[in-house]
Swiss-Prot record:
It catalyses: a 1,2-diacyl-sn-glycero-3-phospho-(1D-myo-inositol-5-phosphate) + ATP = a 1,2-diacyl-sn-glycero-3-phospho-(1D-myo-inositol-4,5-bisphosphate) + ADP + H(+); 1,2-dihexadecanoyl-sn-glycero-3-phospho-(1D-myo-inositol-5-phosphate) + ATP = 1,2-dihexadecanoyl-sn-glycero-3-phospho-(1D-myo-inositol-4,5-bisphosphate) + ADP + H(+); 1,2-dihexadecanoyl-sn-glycero-3-phospho-(1D-myo-inositol-5-phosphate) + GTP = 1,2-dihexadecanoyl-sn-glycero-3-phospho-(1D-myo-inositol-4,5-bisphosphate) + GDP + H(+). This is Phosphatidylinositol 5-phosphate 4-kinase type-2 alpha. Residues 33-405 form the PIPK domain. PROSITE patterns: PIPK. Residues 288-328 are annotated as: Disordered. Residues 59-65 are annotated as: Required for interaction with PIP5K1A. It comes from Mus musculus. GO terms for molecular function: 1-phosphatidylinositol-4-phosphate 5-kinase activity; 1-phosphatidylinositol-5-phosphate 4-kinase activity; ATP binding; protein homodimerization activity. One of its GO terms (cellular component) is photoreceptor outer segment. The modification N6-acetyllysine is found at K89, K145. The gene is Pip4k2a.
Length: 405
């Protein structure tokens, strides 16, 4: 597969402070982005949702829907290259299946389209060990991740069972909410991307985040990672810092029941190496930063007349996010922030936690078995290494998460 190109190379540090972001006003349907691949993604999602709006929703999905795809090749020398490349290809995998999944996750196609096409997605400084790069939609509701062709194949392998599982649990799960999978081709560069619901809030800033696997071998953030404004910390960091998750017994019971069910499903599919992503919002800290930002904004008043605060750009219809009633500090809409849990009343700090399973597309194949054998030789048979078999992995994962809650 060709290198991901600029989609991940122009990465900016994400700010933990709740600064009001500004962007230059952009008319609807321009799809202007700094990266031509992002422009093509915006164009493609817009095209796809428009096409699907004319297709009748079937009573049930058919086996062929899980193999289907739609693709389009555009050769148009009249395009303004400042907005769009003149030659590109866009492919969407299993469009009917992902439309059905969006519906089951309570996501309206029009809202999905607006979030991904109104303004360019924002780069995110998170980077997976695999080299995958991330963007978030401008309104922070969705995450766009580059994936490999092997990931696409694995997604096809599990999609039917994943869909059935989502049907059975009525969309109530800690698993990634897969919402669309696409291939983009521009100037000989080919990349694959998958869109999921953001684990974190579009409104409540996260000041600390952890990627937890239940393993202790080589599970500490590097010095380079820790130097970031919002580093992704790991299991040993969580333990060594004495970090705690303060949720009440009822929320803990509900969370662990969902987690157990989800992880058993992953083990059945022989999937492993997934993580629990944990984000922590500090309510008082966020309030203080909001006050500081408002004071700074007051000083900068009138300096940038050509920009508009984040939200609905001009010349476009209202967004459901911005039309909802204002929420108090630390409050959230559970229909949007589906992974959010409040701390209990006696917690030392008022916090909101965002917790969900991520990175589920690693199958326990020969490659992982070889890695496990090599790590066992290096660290010893009893070491808590991450490449154990799926049943061992799921048990250790559940034990660790149950222990830290």
């Amino acid at each position: 597969m060709a290198t991901p190109g600029n989609l991940g190379s122009s990465v900016l540090a994400s700010k933990t402070k709740t600064k009001k972001k500004h962007f230059v006003a952009q008319k609807v349907k321009l799809f202007r982005a700094s990266d031509p691949l992002l422009s093509v993604l915006m164009w493609g999602v817009n095209h796809s949702i428009n096409e699907l709006s004319h297709v009748q929703i079937p009573v049930m999905l058919m086996p062929d829907d899980f193999k289907a795809y739609s693709k389009i090749k555009v050769d148009n020398h009249l395009f303004n290259k400042e907005n769009m490349p003149s030659h590109f290809k866009f492919k969407e995998y299993c469009p009917m299946v992902f439309r059905n999944l969006r519906e089951r996750f309570g996501i309206d196609d029009q809202d999905f389209q607006n979030s991904l096409t109104r303004s360019a997605p924002l780069p995110n400084d998170s980077q997976a060990r695999s080299g995958a790069r991330f963007h978030t939609s401008y309104d922070k509701r969705y995450v766009i991740k580059t994936i490999t062709s092997e990931d696409v194949a694995e997604m096809h392998n599990i999609l039917k069972k994943y869909h059935q599982y989502i049907v059975e649990c009525h969309g109530v799960t800690l698993l990634p909410q897969f919402l669309g999978m696409y291939r983009l081709n521009v100037d000989g560069v080919e990349i694959y991307v998958i869109v999921t619901r953001n684990v974190f809030s579009h409104r409540l800033s996260v000041y600390r985040k952890y990627d937890l696997k239940g393993s202790t071998v080589a599970r500490e953030a590097s010095d380079k990672e820790k130097a970031k404004e919002l580093p992704t910390l790991k299991d040993n960091d969580f333990i060594n810092e004495g970090q705690k998750i303060y949720i009440d017994d009822n929320n803990k019971k509900i969370f662990l029941e969902k987690l157990k069910k989800d992880v058993e499903f992953l083990a059945q599919l022989k999937l492993m190496d997934y993580s629990l992503l944990v984000g922590i919002h500090d309510v008082e800290r966020a309030e203080q930063e909001e006050v500081e930002c408002e004071e700074n904004d007051g000083e900068e008043e009138g300096e940038s007349d050509s920009t508009h605060p984040i939200g609905t750009p001009p010349d476009s219809p209202g967004n459901t996010l911005n039309s909802s009633p204002p929420l108090a500090p630390g409050e959230f809409d559970p229909n949007i922030d589906v992974y959010a849990i409040k701390c209990h009343e006696n917690a030392p700090r008022k916090e909101v936690y965002f917790m969900a399973i991520i990175d589920i597309l690693t199958h326990y194949d020969a490659k992982k078995k070889a890695a496990h054998a090599a790590k066992t030789v290096k660290h010893g048979a009893g070491a808590e290494i991450s490449t154990v078999n799926p049943e061992q992995y799921s048990k250790r994962f559940l034990d660790f998460i149950g222990h830290i809650l």
